[in-house]
Amino acid sequence: MAKITQTMISQLLAAVGGSSNVSKCGNCMTRLRLTLANNGVADQAVIKQIPGVMGVVESDEQFQIILGPGKAQQAAELMNKLIESVINGDVQEQAMASDTNDLSSVAAEQKKQMKSKQTSAVQRFLSKFATIFTPLIPGFIAAGLLLGFATLLEQMFVLEQTPSQFILDLIAYMKVFGKGLFAFLSILIGYNAQQAFGGSGVNGAILASLFVLGYNPDATSGIYSGMSEFFGYTIDPRGNIIGVLLAAIIGAQVERKVREYMPDDLDMILTSVVTLLIMGVVTFVVIMPIGGELFKGMSWLFLNLNDNPLGAAILAGLFLISVVFGIHQGFVPVYFALMEAQGFNSLFPILAMAGGGQVGASLALYFKAKKDAVLRTQVKGAIIPGILGIGEPLIYGVTLPRVKPFVTACIGGAAGGFFIGLVSYLGLPVGLNTVFGPSGIVAIPLMTSHSGIFAGMAVFVVGLLISYVVGFLATYFFGSKDVDLS
């Protein structure tokens, strides 16, 4: 696979319209995420021809370039440095612009095409979830892995024998990071959410803290807020992540509106004060009760879907499509709801089956292709990340461009999801021990169940194998016909 080089980044920057068209440059695990002043200027055809680019996803405010695992962050750093150099006059963009086939001449045509495929309001909304949750994913994974290893040590050395004090201390040490993360996670999410929707992150963090504080003066745990009611109104901090998101999103809109009317000289002093006073009332009186009911309803819906083999198959089968559109982060609030309802995330292993179907489909294409085919090289470069749980290189480099294998990959994922749902229906739901984590084989030590981690790990592995096999067979016999295998 192509390396991230200065030349490649220069070509990408030119193809999206130059530094003047890039308002913000960031990344997630596999994608370079750009906020462009004018999406119509970006030449997708040119971008897709640049070596190392696996695909392009446009989601209203974000223009996403898929580069693969381990490359997106490097690309974002190089592009930000290049943009800064251009702004400072250290680098001229003239040389870069020559590679774009006169972007200004095609901008008008591109703009017309973009207007014809406007994204939906739902897609625009869900795309912001990547901005909120992507920075938190490394912490979720780290806390989940440490908790998984701690639980494994517990089951091996604590439950059936007298452990040493060192083992007990080690287990407690590995668990403390997860407890710290989940104790204050709402505040981190509130900060990111309000910032993502155009407000000040610190105001979102303060609003989120209202859900963390305690309102019972007699409670023996937590941090007492100093108030047990709000002007005679009983405070019930329900809603969890749903309430926090609602408060931050609405808070961002209120803050922006207040700033419109606030004199510039008073903006820094009073805008946040007025915003918090307004949003405190809204949060205590409206958001907490409504958020609580929404949270309860979401938990009920997905608990029933996860315990139903058909529902689980549908969720797993459609998940790859949500990845293609870049809206898969929209499931994260559901993960929180399930963590609170079950003690683990039972949706994640179902959705992870989609990656298994992708691996099976890609292996089938590998064996169908001739020994000197470029397709084999593409599969070789992307199969290991796919097995480890990062499926975008396989999606954009192997299956999606050929369409049929993408469909059969979805079928493979659905088969694995059906198995996970069936086992849950029979009385053994399994799930991730943290909100979010890696999929693929890396997720095995993070699996758990009410019958222990070994049962959870075993069910997940069998489901993954089913996805591999069904994805392989469906693609080998049906998904590779009339498909470019060169």
Swiss-Prot record:
PTS EIIC type-1 domain mapped to chain residues: 127-486
The main place the protein resides is membrane
All residue ranges annotated as the PTS EIIB type-1 domain in the record? 1-89
User: Which keywords appear in this protein's UniProt record, sorted alphabetically?
Assistant: Cell inner membrane, Cell membrane, Kinase, Membrane, Phosphotransferase system, Sugar transport, Transferase, Transmembrane, Transmembrane helix, Transport
InterPro entries in alphabetical order: Glu_permease_IIB, PTrfase_EIIB_Cys, PTS_EIIC, PTS_EIIC_1, PTS_IIB_1, PTS_Sugar-Specific_Components
* GO biological processes: phosphoenolpyruvate-dependent sugar phosphotransferase system
Q: Reply yes or no: does the keyword Kinase apply.
A: yes
- What is the enzyme's class at the highest EC level? transferase
Catalytic residues (UniProt): C28
Reactions that this protein is recorded to catalyse = N-acetyl-beta-D-muramate(out) + N(pros)-phospho-L-histidyl-[protein] = N-acetyl-beta-D-muramate 6-phosphate(in) + L-histidyl-[protein]
The record's section on Gene3D superfamilies has:
Glucose permease domain IIB
Q: Which residues cross the membrane?
A: 129-149, 170-190, 196-216, 230-250, 268-288, 312-332, 347-367, 381-401, 411-431, 453-473
The residues forming the signal peptide are none
GO MF term (any one): kinase activity
Q: List GO terms (cellular component aspect).
A: plasma membrane
Give the way it sits in the membrane.
Multi-pass membrane protein
Q: Which CDD domains match?
A: PTS_IIB_glc
EC number(s) of the enzyme? 2.7.1.192
Described purpose of this protein according to its UniProt entry: The phosphoenolpyruvate-dependent sugar phosphotransferase system (sugar PTS), a major carbohydrate active transport system, catalyzes the phosphorylation of incoming sugar substrates concomitantly with their translocation across the cell membrane. This system is involved in N-acetylmuramic acid (MurNAc) transport, yielding cytoplasmic MurNAc-6-P. Is also able to take up anhydro-N-acetylmuramic acid (anhMurNAc), but cannot phosphorylate the carbon 6, probably because of the 1,6-anhydro ring.
Record remark: domains: The EIIB domain is phosphorylated by phospho-EIIA on a cysteinyl or histidyl residue, depending on the transported sugar. Then, it transfers the phosphoryl group to the sugar substrate concomitantly with the sugar uptake processed by the EIIC domain.
The record ties this protein, via NCBIfam families, to: PRK09586.1 (NF007152)
User: What name appears for this protein in its UniProt entry?
Assistant: PTS system N-acetylmuramic acid-specific EIIBC component
Q: Which organism is it from?
A: Vibrio vulnificus (strain YJ016)
